[in-house]
Amino acid sequence: MRCHGPILLGLLGLAVCCGCAATDDGSPPPAAKTAPAKAKKGRRAKPAPAVAEPTPAAAPPPPASAEPAAPACPEGMALVEGDHCRAVEQRCLEQLSAADGGADENRCAKFEASKCTSTAPEPRKMRFCMDRYEYPGKVGEKPMTLVSWTDAERVCASHGKRLCTESEFTFACEGEKMLPYTYGYERDAKKCNIDKPYLTPQKHLLPYDQCLANPACAAEYARVDGREPIGSHPECVSPFGIYDLNGNANEWVSQPWKNP
């Protein structure tokens, strides 16, 4: 994935799930075109008698049962649509400093404008729905972590959704401008929950529900936990209106060509 800056928790979150977008925009079909009548061959058409044209009647109001077109995505999801460049050049202009005073090659303070490389294949048309928030998608709650890939896939399926592919996640984060950060080209730790120190768990952490029910596991989880409540960073939002894609918890994605 190209989108930069997820929090370094080492505790993978469940997911932001994806789904299919509606394709019907609700617009009526175009009216059929009618060809003008022609005179029969060999005869001259007689002019029509002069008749006063009636005053056009006002268009009838729409029936009370008429409903607006359905939204492209279900409630809680956002439409992600556009052309996705599959080979992008994102050149770092300024590295952040590491703890030892040197340059941190994994973190870039400022990028130049992204470019779709000359060798890139044709941009891929993308159109899909994506959860606006990390699971469970409730503002004020913390995203769920300590979840396996198979559990994440199962939970998405239980809601009639699926895991996003890696390409979908990247495009939802970058948009057509191929932004290295959802909010632009310069890293800002105040806009997203990023750049917290990584704390290594001193013991094996159980799956989420089991860990919270185990006092020793819950205490260790609380010690290394760097999550913040969903919606805490309103500026950490992608061009499509999806939050925390490069902040807070890491998310699982689907790579159909690989085994999980």
Predicted regions, residues:
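Sec-dependent N-terminal signal peptides
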Residues: 1-26
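Functional-site microenvironments in short loops/helix caps that host divalent-cation chemistry
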Residues: 149-158, 162-260
